[in-house]
Amino acid sequence: MECNIGDIVLVNNFKYPDGSDGSLHSFVVIEIENNELDLMPLEYLCFLVSSNKIKENLPYNIPLKKDSFNRLKHDSHVKCDFIYDGIRKDDILMVVGTVTPNQLDLFWDAYEMFLDDLDEV
């Protein structure tokens, strides 16, 4: 399926960082090279396992409020502390919506802050 940087996509199959299989999850496309995508996971607030207040305060979780542009059904967070890479365009079921260039910049800034914090440890 065709998609662009900044699109919110529903992915059919992917691998979690621990190697286990994942399916039917939403992501934001942050980079495209050839037929492979780099993605940041999007989490609906109601799906977060621990307290929403704790998750909202994590510096690498950037809130994404639902609106007509991104076409989300619920307010969400983009988890900017991990990039899923090598996802094939064939694994995209649908494009849900899109984020603004400013929001995409915020996601990259949060990821860079995460990497900087890792370097300090």
What are the residue ranges of the model-derived segments?
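Compact nucleic-acid interaction/catalytic patches
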Residues: D18-S68
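Extreme N-terminus of proteins, especially the signal/transit-peptide cleavage junction
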Residues: M1-E2, Y111
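A residue-level detector for short acidic-glycine micro-motifs
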Residues: L10, V29-E31, F82
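C-terminal terminal-subdomain/extension
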Residues: K66-V121
